[in-house]
Amino acid sequence: MPHAFKPGDLVFAKMKGYPHWPARIDDIADGAVKPPPNKYPIFFFGTHETAFLGPKDLFPYDKCKDKYGKPNKRKGFNEGLWEIQNNPHASYSAPLPVSSSDSEAPEADLGGGSDADKEKEARRVMTVTAVTTTATSGRTESDSDSDKNSDHSGLKRKTPVLKMSVSKRARKASSDLDQASVSPSEEDSESPSESEKTSDQDFTPEKKTIARAPRRAPLGGRKKKKVPSASDSDSRADSDGAKEEPVVTAQPSPSSSSSSSSSSASDSDVSIKKPPRGRKPAEKPPPKPRGRRSKPERPPSTSSSDSDSDSGEVDRISEWKRRDEERRRELEARRRREQEEELRRLREQEREEKERRKERAERGGSSGEELEDEEPVKKRSRKARGRGTPSSSDSEPEGELGKEGKKLAKKSQLQGSESARKPGQKEKRGRPDEKPRARPVKVERTRKRSEGLSLDRKGEKKKEPSVEERLQKLHSEIKFALKVDNPDVRRCLSALEELGTLQVTSQILQKNTDVVATLKKIRRYKANKDVMAKAAEVYTRLKSRVLGPKVEALQKVNKAGAEKERADGEKVEEQPGEQAPRELAEDEPSTDRSAPVNGEAASQKGENTEDGAQEDGQDLEDGPRGGSSEELHDSPQDSSDPARPGNEHQDHERMQLASESADDDDEDS
């Protein structure tokens, strides 16, 4: 069951991102923001921040002292443990009722009041500022990461009453406000009192903490209207050193003090708002606040020492930042110097390369020894670069320029020595210099020849592989050689011979039927008998390759009796012309019945059309199509078993083919 708490109870409060913090259940001041239901206003010791938390996040101090009361690294936590034990009523927000004497005290001070009052108020301000510096330095450094989670955790400030006083006091005459703003500035600048010195010392570290913890600004709470009141209270405490009450009420968190002290020019605005805050509590006479005011005076020495130590830490941090900035500047300067040096070196190298190219162009053929001389120069330049890079980062640019000048001098000396060697070498060589110039020409010629041969070989290799291409090429050559206007017999004979040597398959002939047709036509080329004979020979070769070797043997055997059986063969030619398939003969009548071939009369061509059509039909069946289906399939069977009774018709067809070939040979002869 959650514990019921009362105002003034000491507890450990748990907020997101923070350990169980020593805190106190606070009173709700008149006019202050009321907490939501089931939540208590909490005052955190050490940091002096306020928040609204539920009972589940609150743990009694006495019961949980051993569990949560252990020292922690978080700055402000150990101070909170000390405060909850030694000063449980500590508070920056002074109670609202203040006596008239207290409210009139700041006005008396502005007009030059008693010295005793000034000293008392100065001591109070010292204690307040000391605690603020400790809180700011601790909370900003340790909780910079956890602040993002706790930005919206519900921290509030107890300064709404002071805001109302500002609105009431805003009607005061401008002359009084100007006097109030001028008097504290003059006191801070001219009076050498110890209280003012301490206030200045406390004010400077607050300014320095701004650079460290600008992120703490949103931690102050959800209401941004109260931030200027906190800044006014801090600057007022540092400038006047005489108004402790308004400073206490308006000091809600270290974040507000750090953000408010960022601008030193806000002193004038602070002085304008001082009198309204001093007079607002004058309406409420109860003298209770004095008892609480005396309590913060107990540990003034410790708070002042803490403020001094914090200011020293801030000074150290600022020194470290300055050193870091100086180092960064030095590094940037070194980088710039190195970049400039690299650019200079690159430019020098480019110039040297250009000079070397010019020298090489002038020298011409004799470049062997020059390359040998250039290699040590490159090595030296590389060594010089290796030496120059580490020294450039440490040495000044003037020393670097001096080193670069030395390098250039060395390079110029080396170039001078090379130029001095050249005339001696030329004198020694004399005429032999001309010979190496002539040699490259011969080498180039040999290279060109070898390249030409290699190209020819490549061309031959490309032509060799494809048989179809050669067949088509020879076909075109034969057609071109047997033109009517200018026939070239030798070229035609050579092409026919090459065509006979080609290893042609039946598939290739089926694709290229035009070749077979032209060979048939050339067999009747009467302008030259050699062409006719060669064409007939090539035609028979192709036919034998397609039909098989046994057909050739039968033809040779039957050649002897071909002359005797001419008459019978002519009669029999009509029968196979009717029986044999005439598909190819019908497909190619146009080729045989086309215009007369070279030197052949139309009448002669017409006489031979009937016989030629039959012969061509059978030949085409045998040649490109591999013969008729019956002949091709039955020929191996006939050779294996010629005595079979069913093969008489096939034997008769073979005899006819043999007789036809014999007749063709006789006609050609």
From Swiss-Prot:
Cross-link Glycyl lysine isopeptide (Lys-Gly) (interchain with G-Cter in SUMO2) mapped to chain: K550
Record-linked InterPro entries: HIVI-bd_sf, LEDGF_IBD, PWWP_dom, TFIIS/LEDGF_dom_sf
PWWP domain sequence ranges: 7-64
Major localization class: nucleus
Phosphothreonine, modified sites: T609
PANTHER family on file: HEPATOMA-DERIVED GROWTH FACTOR-RELATED (PTHR12550), HEPATOMA-DERIVED GROWTH FACTOR-RELATED PROTEIN 2 (PTHR12550:SF18)
Protein name: Hepatoma-derived growth factor-related protein 2
Organism ancestry: Eukaryota, Metazoa, Chordata, Craniata, Vertebrata
